[in-house]
Structures are given as C-alpha cells and as structure tokens.
Regions:
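Non-catalytic regulatory/gating segments with a bias toward low-complexity or hydrophobic composition
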Residues: 22, 82-84, 102-104
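Residues that define the transmembrane beta-barrel architecture of outer-membrane proteins
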Residues: 96-98, 125-129, 174-178
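Extracytoplasmic beta-strand/coil segments of soluble accessory domains associated
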Residues: 19-63, 80
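N-terminal periplasmic "start-of-domain" segments of outer-membrane beta-barrel proteins
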Residues: 1-13, 41, 49
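Extracytoplasmic/secreted envelope proteins and their assembly/folding machinery
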Residues: 2, 7, 15-22, 71, ...
Length: 199
C-alpha cells in the first residue's frame, strides 16, 4: 500500500515536524524521548524503528550514533512530497525496510524565480520562521531553504505530585536548518543533482 502526501497536503496539515506529519498517517506510530529536539522513533506495522527506512531524494538517511534516522532534521518547508510504502521491502532495500519505506522528495527549482516564507508561533514559547527560493533557467535549476525553530520547552514533572520534591526541568530547543538542491538536466532523461542539508 502506497500513500502519497503532496505539497498542498503538507501545508494543510497541523504538524510542524516530519514526525508529527507521519504520525497522522494510518499504520505509523512514533514515540519520543521528550519534547522538541529529542530523538524520535518512527515505527511501521508495529516493528522497531530500525526497520523503517528513510530515503531523501533516493539516498539513505540515517545516524551512525543513534542507529535510526534523525527524522526531524529535515524541515517540512524543504519537502515537495512524501511517499509511504507499507510492508516488507527487504528484498529491494535490505533488513531496515522490513516495516516499510518513507521516501521524501525535496523541492526543485521553479521556472523564473519563486520565493516563499512562513512564520508561526505556539504554546511554550514555540516559534518558527522559514524562507526559501526556487529558480530555474534552461537546463539549470536550484532550490534553497532556510528555517529557524525555537522552543522554550515545558516541564515534564508535576508540581502537584504527592511524593517527592518538585524540580522543574524545562528543556528548550533551538534548531537552524539549511538545505540546497542544484540540478542540471542533460540529454533525454539524464540528470545530475547535488544535494546538501545541514541541521
């Protein structure tokens, strides 16, 4: 079963991170070690997170230290569409695709010059700003995206707890991300691309 989430659906969703967006899809669960910025695990069909493969523009994306992808490193403003394939694909991708595959396609350049931006704010001091531009001329195209996220955090302990001392543990979160995609269309269906992501 394949689910495709296009750009218009991404913009209409309430989720502000990739994990929150995926969690709204049937057959996908996630759990996190805390609030914003903490390691989150995405699970498909009830299997461990290490059995869900994440591809960004066809390239495997993972963490050598965590053993699973860092799902929230990619800002949603950089995403053009998401394809979710549920079920075992280990014959094609290996054991990390037993649960399924999440394939993300980032935004390409657009004819002429297109600029976009977004600002949002929420509870617990959450605020986010994103901007980007897309350009294409002849065989060349480029897309650049910038995003800044800030969150004051919240306390996971309960001030009204019956036992023990209350010790607030507000864990704030700051994230800056930049993504770049350059493309050159060659003869026929041949294309050369360079991708960069820093978060």
């Amino acid at each position: 079963q394949v689910t495709v989430i296009d750009r218009s659906e991404i913009e209409a969703q309430a989720g502000r991170t990739l994990v929150e967006l995926l969690a709204a899809q049937p057959g996908i669960q996630f759990w996190s070690n805390g609030g914003a910025g903490k390691l989150a695990t995405v699970s498909m069909r009830g299997l461990e997170g290490r059995h869900t493969l994440l591809l960004i523009d066809g390239v495997r994306y993972g963490s050598a230290t965590a053993g699973i992808p860092i799902w929230d490193n990619l800002p949603l403003d950089a995403v053009e569409r998401i394809e979710i394939v549920r079920g075992p694909l280990s014959a094609l991708y290996g054991s990390d695709a037993v649960g399924g595959v999440v394939q993300i396609f980032t935004r390409k350049g657009a004819p002429g010059l297109a600029v976009h931006g977004r600002v949002s704010a929420g509870s617990h001091g959450q605020r986010q700003a994103a901007a980007g531009l897309r350009w294409a001329s002849g065989p060349w195209d480029a897309a650049l995206g910038l995003q800044a996220s800030r969150d004051d955090g919240f306390s996971a302990t309960n001030a009204r707890a019956q036992f023990g001392n209350y010790n607030a543990d507000r864990d704030g979160f700051d994230q800056d991300a930049v993504n770049l995609r350059l493309g050159l269309q060659l003869a026929g269906d041949w294309r050369v691309e360079a991708l960069a992501l820093d978060s």
